[in-house]
Regions:
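Conserved donor-nucleotide binding/catalytic region of nucleotide-linked donor-dependent transferases
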Residues: 107-122, 142-150
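Short hydrophobic beta-strand element within catalytic cores of glycosyltransferases
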Residues: 72, 76-79, 89
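C-terminal alpha-helical cap of glycosyltransferases
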Residues: 129-163
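A short, well-ordered alpha-helix in the C-terminal region of glycosyltransferases
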Residues: 113-129, 135, 154
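Nucleotide-activated donor-binding/catalytic signature segment of Leloir-type glycosyltransferases, i.e.
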Residues: 7-9, 20-45, 52
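Acidic donor-binding loop of glycosyltransferase active sites
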Residues: 48-62, 75
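Short glycine/serine-rich donor-binding loops of glycosyltransferases
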Residues: 64-67, 85
Length: 163
């Protein structure tokens, strides 16, 4: 099964040389298309119509918002296990975590059979704004409880010494 590759990206000035030497030669292939930079309104349609998002990050990406955006559209993610990828992608549920180009090619065939509703459900279970807000509030409450616990104990001791 031949699968096309559509590249959507902004090419910053610092990346032009890399783009010209590494990416442009690939654009001669009939299955490779460079879309360029896309806006927020185009992104939802682009990701929603994609078979998968290929996220070949090779550095410790702290989060990778585009993975979440793809999952919100029900689009599985194929990504290397760097940075936040293992925390964001539920391997076999919302995508595949791979460690090579060959594994990514195999994963592209596998994710074609993934239930996009389950990908979306994984997003809703873990990454909606409401879910993340609830998790943040719980974390803040835990931190506040830990921070104030020694203070309360110290205050009780001082009060007991005065009386």
């Amino acid at each position: 099964m031949d699968v096309g590759l559509k590249l959507a990206a902004k090419v910053d000035a610092v990346d032009i040389a890399y783009f010209e030497t590494e990416i442009e030669p690939l654009l001669d292939h009939p299955l490779v298309e460079f879309i360029g930079e896309i806006g927020e309104t185009q992104k939802s349609e682009f990701l929603g119509n994609a078979r998968a998002l290929l996220f070949p990050i090779d550095w410790p990406e702290p989060f990778g918002l585009v993975m979440i955006e793809a999952m919100s559209a029900g689009t599985p993610v194929i990504a290397w296990p760097n940075g936040s990828v293992p925390e964001v992608i539920a391997d076999g549920v919302s995508g595949r975590i791979v460690d090579s180009i060959d594994a990514a090619a195999g994963a592209a065939r596998q994710v074609a059979h993934m239930d996009r509703r389950k990908v979306r459900a994984e997003f809703e279970r873990r990454f909606t704004a409401e879910r993340m807000a609830v998790a943040h509030i719980a974390a803040y409450r835990l931190l506040l409880a830990r921070a104030s616990a020694p203070t309360r104990a110290l205050s009780r001791r001082r009060w007991a010494c005065r009386h």
